[in-house]
Amino acid sequence: MLYMVIEHFREGAAPLIYERFREKGRMAPPGARYLSSWVTTDFERCFQVMDCDDRMLLDEWMSNWSDIVDFEVIPIITSEKANAAIAPHL
């Protein structure tokens, strides 16, 4: 399943986040796959698409960052799947 993970960087934490990433990498467990991400120009948020079959894997991954990042996790589907799902209701 796909998830939009919105990372809310804690105040002043952006340098710490990037330093930790350089030293330790993403720290996602096997089965939690990173697809892509975008960071706001003010370094306050990151919008990240992750793919995994077990939501608990995301919790495990987020626990590695929860001291400097607050997370919002939203299950998502592709536009193609959304179009197919809504078609019978049109």
How should these model regions be labeled?
Residues I68-S79:
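Conserved short beta-strand edge segments in small beta-sheet-based binding/regulatory domains
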Residues M1-L35, V39-R45, D53-L57, I77-L90:
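Short S/T/G/P-rich N-terminal loop/turn motif that feeds into the first structured element of a domain
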Residues V49:
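Small, basic N-terminal interaction modules of short regulatory proteins
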Residues M62:
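Short, flexible helix/strand-to-coil boundary loops that buttress conserved ligand/catalytic motifs
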